[in-house]
Amino acid sequence: MKGNMNNMMKQMQKMQKKMMQAQDELHEMTFEATAGGGMVTVKASGKKEIIDVEIKEEVVDPDDIDMLQDLILAATNDVLNQIDEKTNDTMGQFTKGMNMPGMF
């Protein structure tokens, strides 16, 4: 019985190490999304930090700031959703079969 418990603890430690490595790899990744046919591009790290916003000159219209704001929001939300999906896919492999809602 004690051997089984030790074995299980070793397995958990291995899984924890793999999870941390996967999380580190996610944090190092860069994600990119565009809106308006490439008029606005937003780049973010896997830590959900916005690292770059590119706006094409043609889309800057002082009389239509709302459109530019909408494009920035759309690209930002898209890139954040990409990060969430990748995180769920990557980390989900560790929680398959476990009942841990809202873990990631």
Curated annotation (Swiss-Prot):
This is Nucleoid-associated protein OB0030. Gene3D superfamilies: Nucleoid-associated protein YbaB-like domain. Coiled coil: none annotated. The keyword DNA-binding applies. Its main location: cytoplasm. The lineage of its organism: Bacteria, Bacillati, Bacillota, Bacilli, Bacillales. One of its GO terms (molecular function) is DNA binding. InterPro entries: YbaB-like_sf (IPR036894), YbaB/EbfC (IPR004401). It comes from the Bacteria. Binds to DNA and alters its conformation. May be involved in regulation of gene expression, nucleoid organization and DNA protection. Belongs to the YbaB/EbfC family. Keywords: Cytoplasm, DNA-binding. Homodimer. It is found in: Cytoplasm, Nucleoid. GO terms for cellular component: bacterial nucleoid; cytosol. Residues 1-23 are annotated as: Disordered.
